[in-house]
Amino acid sequence: MGQPGNRSVFLLAPNGSHAPDQDVPQERDEAWVVGMAIVMSLIVLAIVFGNVLVITAIAKFERLQTVTNYFITSLACADLVMGLAVVPFGASHILMKMWTFGSFWCEFWISIDVLCVTASIETLCVIAVDRYLAITSPFKYQCLLTKNKARVVILMVWVVSGLISFLPIKMHWYQATHREALNCYAEEACCDFFTNQPYAIASSIVSFYLPLVVMVFVYSRVFQVARRQLQKIDKSEGRFHAQNLSQAEQDGRSGPGHRRSSKFCLKEHKALKTLGIIMGTFTLCWLPFFIVNIVHGIHDNLIPKEVYILLNWVGYVNSAFNPLIYCRSPDFRMAFQELLCLHRSSLKAYGNGCSSNSNGRTDYTGEQSGCYLGEEKDSERLCEDAPGPEGCAHRQGTVPDDSTDSQGRNCSTNDSML
């Protein structure tokens, strides 16, 4: 977000920086500028490189092109725009202690900042709903949320985020009326984000707090369902291992299918944990800033400008974290290694999401859906049924399954969803 203009000091400026006529303070000021420039440059490089890698991996490898990963792409795009159009100009503003890009770009820069944060948290809300549908209604999931519908949802997220961010700023609904703010608005070299109290509170609620409440509520429901499923897996595994060996042999499909289903569900829950880490990291990085933003809107001089800007940059750094979190996924790790030419030999068939069998035939591995624990006591179904002897069904799953059908073909699902 833009910097509040209630003070004239700058982020982490060293003591004595206001006495340029003294050699020691001037040297300290130069050292501070160089040090901060290096740190900020590394942040920008990490954001851009990491998110370009994520977007390229999903675009190149068909195995990663799942509904959930479409939303991950949207999130990576928001982070990439943050790294290209927001963070560098924010760094320049701090280091040069003035705005050098004109009043039009000042408003545009602030609008893009709000856009990226709003689009990110709205996308996280959509991912939470996506996972809720996948884990509670796996058999309806394919119809409820197709790839085309996912594209429409992503478009709506960006349109709504654009209206929330650009409209109030371009219409100047945010502007404060006190003298310091008016002087800043009239000066092109000033890009401090002075806001009136209604805008500060309303924008924080609409852009952050409301989506945050929705995200936390939906994802808490997802984890409640996941916990119940894990408990059923534990109970069912105990019953399975207690069965007589002869009974297991009489039912050739129940044993392996049961193990595959349990493995599938457990890895689905691991994927949920990864998405939970992404959402938790975003919340931890941005929540302090938006708390301060509300306080700043109510009492202008209560929060030092250094604290405001520092918390803003903590939020910026979040854009570099997500690519690191995606490395929890084996498929993302392999894709990153392939793109960086670190592990080419084992990824020959990776790009099209296919796996070759001993007969030289290739089977396509489908995309993800959720894990399901049915209530039927007679079948004790844990997830989707394993492929029958007719061949590999077009199963959907988030994790690899090393099973084969009766003809020796690989019926494994993939781990493309984190």
UniProtKB/Swiss-Prot annotation:
A lipid is attached at residues 265, 341 (S-palmitoyl cysteine). Residues 1-34, 96-106, 175-196, 299-305 are extracellular. The modification Phosphoserine is found at residues 246, 261-262, 345-346, 355-356. Residues 59-71, 130-150, 221-274, 330-418 are cytoplasmic. Palmitoylated; may reduce accessibility of Ser-345 and Ser-346 by anchoring Cys-341 to the plasma membrane. Agonist stimulation promotes depalmitoylation and further allows Ser-345 and Ser-346 phosphorylation. Phosphorylated by PKA and BARK upon agonist stimulation, which mediates homologous desensitization of the receptor. PKA-mediated phosphorylation seems to facilitate phosphorylation by BARK. GO terms for cellular component: early endosome; Golgi apparatus; plasma membrane; receptor complex. This is Beta-2 adrenergic receptor. The gene is ADRB2.
